Design a protein with these regions (language model features):
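FAD-dependent oxidoreductase catalytic-site/capping-region signature
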Residues: 1-137, 145-155
Length: 155
C-alpha cells in the first residue's frame, strides 16, 4: 500500500550554503516537522493495516514486514514509518508568493522581492501544494504571469 498526505503542514527549507552558485544548497525536507503530519501518517498506516486484515484480502496479503504486527503503539510505529517516508508531492512553495518579503519570495506579480527584473514563474510560487498533479496549475501560473509581464512591458 502507498498513500500520501495531500495537505501537509510541515514546511521545509532551502538554504544557500556558499556565494558560489555551483555549491549545492542545504535542502531540509522537514517532512514530519509538524505533529499533525505525523498523526496523519499514523492514521493512514492504521487504515492500511485494517484494509490488509479485511477477510476478503487477508488470504492474499503476507505478513506485515514493517513495523510488524507486534508494533501497536505510536512510539513503536513512527520510527519504522520514518524509515520509509518520502515526499510524494511535486515541489511547490519554495519561493512562495506574498506581500511581505520576510516570509515570501515573490510579490503578487511574480516579481522577486528586492531584485529588479527577476520573476519566478512556476509552481514554487504557490504557497501551498495542490491536491493533484501540478501540470495544470503550472500552465495557469505561466499564462497569468505572461499576461502580467506583457502589461508591465506596455506600461
Amino acid at each position: 500500500f502507498s498513500g500520501y498526505h495531500l495537505r501537509p503542514r510541515s514546511r521545509g527549507s532551502v538554504t544557500v550554503t556558499a556565494p558560489d552558485y555551483k555549491t549545492a544548497p542545504l535542502v531540509d525536507m522537514n517532512i514530519w516537522g509538524d505533529d499533525y503530519d505525523r498523526q496523519k501518517a499514523l492514521e493512514l498506516f492504521r487504515l492500511f493495516r485494517s484494509i490488509a486484515a479485511a477477510p476478503a484480502l487477508a488470504p492474499y496479503i503476507g505478513a506485515e514486514r514493517m513495523p510488524g504486527a507486534q508494533a501497536d503503539s505510536d512510539a513503536a510505529i513512527l520510527p519504522e514509518l520514518a524509515k520509509m517516508v518520502e515526499a510524494g508531492l511535486h515541489g511547490t512553495g519554495t519561493c512562495s508568493m506574498g506581500t511581505d518579503a520576510k516570509d515570501s519570495v515573490t510579490d503578487a506579480r511574480t516579481r522577486v522581492h528586492g531584485i529588479d527584473g527577476l520573476r519566478i514563474v512556476d509552481c514554487s510560487i504557490m504557497p501551498t501544494p495542490v491536491s493533484g498533479n501540478t501540470n495544470g496549475p503550472a500552465m495557469a501560473v505561466a499564462h497569468v504571469a505572461a499576461e502580467m509581464i506583457l502589461e508591465d512591458a506596455r506600461g
